[in-house]
From Swiss-Prot:
PANTHER family: PEROXIDE STRESS RESISTANCE PROTEIN YAAA, PEROXIDE STRESS RESPONSE PROTEIN YAAA. It comes from Idiomarina loihiensis (strain ATCC BAA-735 / DSM 15497 / L2-TR). Belongs to the UPF0246 family. This is UPF0246 protein IL2146. HAMAP family: UPF0246. Pfam families: H2O2_YaaD (PF03883). GO terms for cellular component: cytosol. GO terms for biological process: response to hydroperoxide. It comes from the Bacteria.
């Protein structure tokens, strides 16, 4: 099976890395085209477009200016180790063993507004460009129009290489909307993580994001072969809830966190 996750806004280009066989992003020509579009915008325009502070807008304008090919280990960092949000706290790439890292390179993909689809060991230079950004570009009015079928076709290629017809969706709606289910050669399985709050089970964003990372880690370490194997996930107190689940949506519940 192939799993997809969202990227993170926060980045880590400081911490130590293990020895890794890094790779190049496969849609770099597209990324370069988008960087050129973003370079035409002033920091103020970027700030307005992305709804970020002047300080962050200045930082990201500078990142687009400094972005350059070729990528190497001095100017870029493997994607799985560069993102630093709640999903990546759950994934905890720094503690994965070499076998799990190898599995990740085959079975985990990171969706990206700038790079399209990243493998975990693909080098990336720092950026901020969320998939939902309404960026005018040569192919349309937003990034969904820009990427079109390209992301889905790349996932199809990865699924074919795995000999798999199952895609595990661990991404947010914003990012997974860049995947075209009608073009995808796979069944989509979406794990949902619910936490108890005042006697009700509901999705709490902070916990759910971390749980998606934990599920990605489970896939890399346990190598589930089937959807039923995914139901064995029990990290951090979550357990599969048959009654709330359906064929395509696996619901995991957890008692209230005290």
């Amino acid at each position: 099976m192939l799993a997809v996750v969202s990227p993170a806004k926060n980045l880590d280009y400081e911490s130590d890395l293990p020895e890794l066989n890094v790779t190049q992003p496969r849609l770099l020509d597209n990324a370069e085209e988008l960087v050129e579009v973003c370079r035409q915008l002033s920091p103020q325009q970027l700030g307005s477009l992305m709804k970020i502070s002047d300080k962050l807008a200045g930082l990201n304008a500078a990142r687009f200016e400094e972005w350059q090919r070729p990528f190497n280990e001095n100017n870029a960092r493997p994607a799985m180790y560069a993102f630093n949000g709640d999903v990546y706290t759950g994934l905890d790439a720094a503690s994965l063993n070499s076998e799990a890292i190898g599995t990740a390179q085959k079975q985990l993909r990171i969706l990206s507004g700038l790079y399209g689809v990243l493998r975990p060991l693909d080098l990336m230079q720092p950026y901020r460009l969320e998939m939902g950004t309404k960026l005018d570009n040569p192919k349309g009015k937003n990034l969904y129009e820009y990427w079109g079928d390209s992301i889905t076709q790349m996932l199809n290629k990865d699924l074919a290489e795995l000999g798999s017809s199952t895609l595990v969706n661990l991404a947010s709606n914003e990012y997974f909307s860049a995947v075209k289910p009608k073009v995808l050669n796979a069944d989509i399985i979406t794990p949902v993580f619910k936490d108890e709050k005042n006697g009700q089970y509901k999705v709490i964003s902070f916990y759910a994001k971390k749980a998606r990372g934990l599920m990605a880690r489970f896939i890399l370490n346990q190598k589930p072969k089937s959807v039923s194997d995914l139901k064995e996930f029990d990290a951090n107190g979550y357990s599969f809830n048959e009654a709330m689940s359906s064929d395509k949506q696996l619901v995991f519940c957890r008692a209230e966190q005290k």
